[in-house]
From Swiss-Prot:
UniProt keyword Hydrolase, yes or no: no
Pfam families referenced in this protein's UniProt entry, alphabetically: LptD (PF04453), LptD_N (PF03968)
The species this protein was found in: Xanthomonas euvesicatoria pv. vesicatoria (strain 85-10)
Subunit comment: Component of the lipopolysaccharide transport and assembly complex. Interacts with LptE and LptA.
Keywords of the record: Cell outer membrane, Membrane, Signal
Name by which UniProt lists this protein: LPS-assembly protein LptD
Sequence similarity: Belongs to the LptD family.
Lineage, opening ranks: Bacteria, Pseudomonadati, Pseudomonadota, Gammaproteobacteria, Lysobacterales
Xref: Gene3D superfamilies: Lipopolysaccharide (LPS) transport protein A like domain (2.60.450.10)
NCBIfam families: PRK04423.1
Gene that encodes the chain: lptD
GO CC terms in record: cell outer membrane; transporter complex
């Protein structure tokens, strides 16, 4: 009797065909009716994934109101039900012939399992020849909300054919979109289907026609077309990308990425991915022959991958290359991270980690991607870099060491020829390209930096005390070109060694209190940090990768004010800071936190990076005896929806603020949000205003279906916007449409660009158009509500392979 259930998987062919192209990101089904298109059937087993996995080993039970016929031709009548595990098949009548293998089920034929439901008028076939036919079908995917119908389904073994079938995720009474196909061939053994003359309808209007296409019906990948992406911008014109997926092997595949830009021409791209037991990788390449705007060939190559050597060691690489310094500007449209977009980093290395140690051997190289700069702005290449760290408790002590050896090289910088008189850079870009006439040679050198330390962390219920003593030794081996560069003294093997001593101590007080009828736990957390580092003259040391840290609250508790090992500031200073928090006792949420601190300098700090060999290192003010700027941070949760935050630095020497930022956020219903921020920074070198910006962004739900989105990012210094976004979103049970208009600064010269982005999301099927989610998630903090509580990887700029003890407070 178990073979009688052979017909049960047939409707799954319909169920899996079209939704196999569904989007990976979570979908919002909140606007869908609570009632399923096909409610669960009476008498059907409850959904049970475990039973679904075991169904082939379970027996089949059959029941009905009446049983007639003979032992070879039984007939079941009235409420016929077949059950096996999570499967249920019901019908009004079931006739069988055990000698010929024929069967007929008719009258209210219905089927249900954990993921699928179906009703049909009639099902008939032959178990021996494994041929089946089901007529007048309606079905529903329980988890995906997909539903539709088919006039009939024919099955011969593992090959089936559906006639006049449809698919949608909409309410059947109001199908905003649906896919119709007069004929779909399904091969369950090979795992693919072939649709002919399929049409995507929005309402009753056909919008896409597919004369023939193949698609997967299970998790096995299949070669075929992916949904296109298109957009419109002032730089590229009409932009159309048609991905073509190639399933080359179970462990590697490729995607062809032909792209047409009306103002530039055809770009040919490809993406290749591979996967094996010990690692994976991905390489992407693009080539644009004879760009119509630039009159030259353009291209790029990107690779990333890793290989697990063993449980402790992993090899990783990330390679980036572009054909010219305008490539990033012309083919990307990000406004955030413009500084990082001025260069591309390529790295390759092997990295290890253990219970008490980390180590690595790597090399990197930088490429300039901003035509407004020259190679002097590039960081030094590290070719190679080796590092080792070790840290372990030893009784009441904790000992550790950080060691690094690096060979630094730099691409020679070239001068830029002046423009032709009366012309612009865009008109004569060739006159601006870098030539082979060298203006300056940076030279190269090697550096060894070793920093052993020992500390004694002591703590109690309301206090902690951690004295630490370290010794830092740094040695260089410079080539003559670099050693003879001013202001270096010609010494090719300079060294520096010095002790570092610190004492970190703090107290913790708390009390129970109430405010406006709410009970709180109020804390007071004073902290003291003393640092002593003797002065060493470091003017003969080059500057390779060292910059001053941006002064912040965390900087109050570090033993150096530099990132990198080329400078170690002298210090005789004491940090005094305090933090106070108000924590709600009923749920532990922080209502208010206030932090403030200041460094007291008992003597001048004479070490600076001024007058170094590296012009890109910038300059800094000498730290004089006295007091640092006051640093204050505050966060206030007005209620569960409204929060405010502020950071403020006030300099008692200049009696001016060095930095100020204010931000507020209001959470609306239906995942709406409003953000408002102000940022100010003063240039400490010449006391001029360095940055003054206002930023307003929102996702405002007008009603459950409509919402407005926007951003206005404005520079008060330049008196011009940096980015303007305006758009609307329409959402329904099964369809979402987003339209954006965007104006943004596209380069350091302040030139503006415009773009229009439109995206259609057919829920449970796919999306086409430009990826507006990426733009809105970057521009509107909280567009994805989870981003308020998690740090998105795209927003972190620290390279995990660049361990630096100076970054650890």
């Amino acid at each position: 009797m178990r073979r009688a259930l052979r017909l049960l998987p047939l409707p799954l062919s319909i169920a899996i065909c079209l939704p196999a192209m569904a989007a990976d990101k979570p979908l919002n089904w909140g606007l869908c009716p609570a009632v399923d298109p096909l409610p669960g059937f009476d008498g059907a087993p409850a959904a049970d994934p475990k039973a679904a996995e075991m169904r082939q080993q379970l027996p089949t039970d059959i029941e009905g109101d009446q049983l007639s016929g003979t032992s070879t031709t039984p007939q079941y009548q009235g409420n016929v039900a077949l059950k096996r595990g999570d499967q249920f098949l019901g019908a009004d009548n079931l006739r069988m012939d055990t000698e010929t293998g024929n069967y007929i089920a008719e009258g209210n034929v219905r089927y249900q399992d954990t993921s699928f439901r179906m009703v049909a008028d009639r099902a008939e076939g032959n178990q021996d020849t494994d041929t089946h036919k089901v007529t007048n079908i309606q079905y529903q995917l329980v988890e995906r909300r997909g539903n539709g119908d088919a006039e009939s389904v024919d099955l011969q073994g593992q090959v089936g054919q559906m006639h006049r079938s449809t698919y949608t995720t909409c309410d059947p009474s109001q199908p905003i979109w649906r896919v119709r196909a007069p004929e779909i061939d399904v091969d369950n053994e090979e795992g693919f289907g072939t649709a002919r003359n399929a049409v995507l309808q929005i309402g009753k209007v056909p919008v896409l026609y597919f004369p023939w296409f193949k698609f997967p019906i299970d998790d096995r990948r299949q070669t075929g077309l992916l949904f296109p992406q298109f957009g419109l911008s002032g730089r590229n014109g009409f932009d159309y990308l048609q991905p073509i997926y190639l399933n080359l092997a179970p462990n590697y595949d490729a995607t062809l990425l032909p792209r047409y830009m009306s103002k530039r021409g055809f770009m040919f791209g490809t993406e290749f991915r591979y996967l094996y037991e010990g690692g994976r990788g991905e390489v992407t390449g693009n080539y644009l022959p004879n760009d119509k705007l630039r009159d030259k060939d353009r291209g790029s190559v990107f690779y990333s991958g890793y290989h697990n050597v063993n449980s402790n060691w992993q090899a990783r690489s990330s390679i980036s290359w572009v054909s010219d310094t305008r490539y990033v500007e012309d083919f990307t449209s990000r406004i955030n991270g413009m500084g990082s977009a001025s260069s591309l980093q390529s790295t390759v290395g092997i990295y290890g980690t253990g219970e008490t140690w980390t180590a690595g051997l790597m090399a990197d190289r930088w490429q300039l991607t901003d035509y407004t700069l020259d190679e002097q702005a590039l960081p030094y290449n590290r070719q190679p870099r080796a590092y080792f760290t070790w840290e372990k408790p030893l009784g009441i002590f904790e000992a550790g060491i950080y060691a690094e050896a690096v060979r630094f090289t730099h691409d020679d910088s070239y001068f830029v020829r002046p423009p032709i008189s009366g012309s612009s850079r865009d008109d004569n870009e060739d006159e601006y390209v870098r030539t082979n006439i060298r203006n300056k040679q940076y030279g190269s050198g090697a550096r060894l930096d070793v920093k052993p330390y020992i500390s004694m962390p002591l703590s109690g219920a309301a206090w902690f005390l951690t004295p630490t003593v370290a010794w830092r030794y740094t040695a260089y081996q410079l080539d003559s070109t670099l050693a003879d560069t001013a202001p270096l003294t010609g010494n090719r093997t300079p060294t520096r060694s010095l002790p570092i001593a610190s004492l970190d101590a703090g107290l913790y007080f708390d009390r129970e209190t109430s405010l406006f009828g709410t009970n709180y736990l109020n804390t007071l957390e004073p902290r003291m940090y003393y640092l002593y580092v003797p002065y060493r003259d470091q003017d003969d040391l080059p500057v390779f990768d060292t910059r001053p840290f941006t002064f912040s609250y965390g900087q109050l508790f570090r033993d150096t004010r530099y990132t990198g090992a080329d400078r170690q500031n002298d210090a005789n200073q004491l940090t005094l800071a305090v933090t106070s928090r108000w924590l709600r006792q009923d749920d532990g949420r922080e209502k208010l936190s206030l932090s403030a601190g200041q460094i007291l300098y008992f003597s001048d700090s004479l070490v600076t990076i001024n007058n170094s060999n590296n012009s890109a290192a910038g300059s800094e003010q000498t730290v004089e005896q006295g007091k640092s700027a006051w640093v204050a941070d505050a966060n206030y949760m007005i209620n569960d929806r409204w929060s405010m935050g502020a950071t403020y630095q006030w300099n008692p020497n200049s009696r001016k603020e060095d930095l100020a930022s204010l931000r507020t956020r209001y959470l609306l219903n239906n995942d709406g949000i409003i953000n408002l921020a102000y940022r100010y920074r003063r240039n400490l070198t010449d006391n001029s205003d360095q940055l003054k910006q206002a930023d307003f962004s929102f996702l405002y739900p007008i009603n459950p279906s409509w919402s407005a989105v926007g951003r206005y990012y404005y520079s008060l210094l330049d008196r011009k916007p940096l980015e303007i976004i305006g758009g609307v979103q329409w959402d329904s049970c099964c369809l979402a449409v987003r339209g954006l208009v965007r104006r943004f600064v596209r380069n350091r010269d302040g030139e503006m660009d415009n773009s229009i982005q439109i995206e259609f999301v057919l829920k449970g099927l796919s999306s086409f158009g430009q990826n507006t989610d990426r733009t809105l998630r970057r521009a509107i903090l909280g567009y994805y509500r989870d981003d308020l509580y998690l740090v998105p990887p795209s927003n972190t700029t620290t390279n995990p392979d660049d361990y630096d003890p100076n970054l650890i407070p």
